[in-house]
Regions:
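Flexible active-site lid/hinge loop adjacent to a nucleotide/diphosphate
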Residues: 1-80
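Adenine nucleotide phosphate-binding catalytic loops in nucleotide-utilizing enzymes
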Residues: 44-52, 79-172
Length: 172
């Protein structure tokens, strides 16, 4: 902060919440993408209910919670939240919705496009195909909306966003 940092993006694990590593930190935005039973064991969570409970605590430590409306555990995750909620997904009930998703392909190119509806309304195309990419882009868009990032800049950033090694074209 003293060096001019105005924003920090950090991953907060359920284990970090459980071990109180972020106790006393009140986040502007907390994001819930999804939950799968993959952190169960003696070193993390005793069972799925404990894992779910710990994940949901983030929504008591932030001003705004951005939550995947399509996750099957949505209702449990938001139970007892103290923040304002915004949702995203394919659900008609989501505040930011992806509609008309289509694979887009061409020579040496594979992507996905959809129409964003709800709190914002524009066409989105990303270079990484798959439903997970739509969810990731919806999350990014929801966060950008809070920082008043323009539609033009959101679209530019989504067009160049890449993860090395993930759905990467390999020339043969």
């Amino acid at each position: 902060v003293s060096n001019g940092c105005v924003c920090c993006v950090m991953e907060v694990s359920s284990q970090g919440i459980k071990m109180q590593r972020v106790e006393g930190i009140f986040f502007d935005i907390g994001v819930f993408l999804n939950i799968e039973p993959d952190h169960i064991g003696p070193n993390e969570h005793k069972d799925f209910d404990d894992y779910l409970r710990c994940k949901s605590l983030l929504l008591k430590q932030c001003k705004v919670g951005i939550v995947n409306r399509d996750d099957e555990h949505f209702e449990k995750i938001i139970e007892g939240h103290t923040c304002s909620l915004e949702t995203y997904g394919f659900s008609p009930e989501a505040d930011l919705r992806a509609e008309d998703a289509k694979l887009v392909g061409g020579k040496g190119y594979l992507g996905i496009s959809y129409h964003l509806k709800g709190l914002l309304d524009f066409h989105v195309e990303i270079d990484i195909p798959g439903k997970f990419s739509i969810y990731n882009s919806l999350t990014a868009i929801a966060i950008c909306r809070h920082f008043k990032v323009s539609e033009e800049n959101i679209l530019k950033a989504l067009k160049v966003a890449k993860v090395k090694g993930r759905i990467e074209m390999v020339k043969v």
